[in-house]
Amino acid sequence: MKALHFGAGNIGRGFIGKLLADAGIQLTFADVNQVVLDALNARHSYQVHVVGETEQVDTVSGVNAVSSIGDDVVDLIAQVDLVTTAVGPVVLERIAPAIAKGQVKRKEQGNESPLNIIACENMVRGTTQLKGHVMNALPEDAKAWVEEHVGFVDSAVDRIVPPSASATNDPLEVTVETFSEWIVDKTQFKGALPNIPGMELTDNLMAFVERKLFTLNTGHAITAYLGKLAGHQTIRDAILDEKIRAVVKGAMEESGAVLIKRYGFDADKHAAYIQKILGRFENPYLKDDVERVGRQPLRKLSAGDRLIKPLLGTLEYGLPHKNLIEGIAAAMHFRSEDDPQAQELAALIADKGPQAALAQISGLDANSEVVSEAVTAYKAMQ
């Protein structure tokens, strides 16, 4: 089996690319970073530090790389069985034209073996969004052929991969946590379902997408925002602060109550999942900076994201949300000189006041009780 993976960054190399290569799949990375491409093509291998209770170093080998702009990547798309991405949500639109060209070439060459495409991004139904961009880039006469022969498979991904300060300055070395979860929608594949260790198949993807968003992402963000306010440097420092831990755990329990009501998750298993995530935040090997995790607060405070979406669920089912409100208030306080969204947030609050600003960012009704609760919590933190 042959695969092409867009994005040879830390997540591409440390998570998805590693799982594919470990499964014995012939893997080529596509990227724009020439330093990384040259290193991959010189060595065809790299090291991954897997850190948890213990630390181990795995070697990923037998990999190649091509530029994601140019003819080589188009040629590969015409040949491979699987295309995956870890490029970040905003970059999906930029790689769509190359994917479209590759599919046209595939059709011209008469290659009717199924191709499956899986976007492994921190977003809901990212592959469906990528499909929209690809379809827009396709000529009309290729669209029906692509619908028939190409599967666009949505997925949920979860593995903490912090930017690694490599002691050796090796551009390929990467550190990842032991935990990893890659869940894909088995109803969207064309052809036989792949057997890749570390990839889980489900016919109820949205339950797992929301479980991750409402637990890991919600907890991670609130840990970062409360940690930054309290003067902590890393996620580990913040979660070891008992006051912060109580709010983070409480918020994950509140969002968890929504999941249990909505999808019928087992309450005991979900409580264990929350404990596992708290343990991941404590990982001493992951130097996960609160400022990195907190960046882009406008996106994180938007209606469909990790803070407001679970809050809306608590309103829908009439459930408590005191700790989620604390997290939202802390997010409104997030300041970072390196993050344009943090600066925009500060300017918006200074200009309109916290009530109107939160309503504008989140889509919540400015006069609602929940916005008033958030503003009260926000002011109490000043």
From Swiss-Prot:
Modification N6-acetyllysine occurs at: K269
InterPro entries (UniProt xref): 6-PGluconate_DH-like_C_sf, 6PGD_dom2, Mannitol_1_phos_5_DH, Mannitol_DH, Mannitol_DH_C, Mannitol_DH_CS, Mannitol_DH_N, NAD(P)-bd_dom_sf
One annotated GO biological process: mannitol catabolic process
MF GO annotations: mannitol-1-phosphate 5-dehydrogenase activity
EC number assigned by the record: 1.1.1.17
Catalysed reaction, written as an equation: D-mannitol 1-phosphate + NAD(+) = beta-D-fructose 6-phosphate + NADH + H(+)
Entry GO terms, CC: cytosol
Taxonomy, superkingdom: Bacteria
Sites where the protein binds NAD(+): A3, L4, H5, F6, G7, A8, G9, N10, I11, G12, R13, G14
UniProt keyword annotation of NAD present: yes
Keywords from the named record: Acetylation, NAD, Oxidoreductase
Subunit (UniProt): Monomer.
Family: Belongs to the mannitol dehydrogenase family.
UniProt-listed NCBIfam families: PRK02318.1-2, PRK02318.1-3, PRK02318.1-4, PRK02318.2-2, PRK02318.2-5
UniProt-recorded name of the protein: Mannitol-1-phosphate 5-dehydrogenase
Gene giving rise to this polypeptide: mtlD
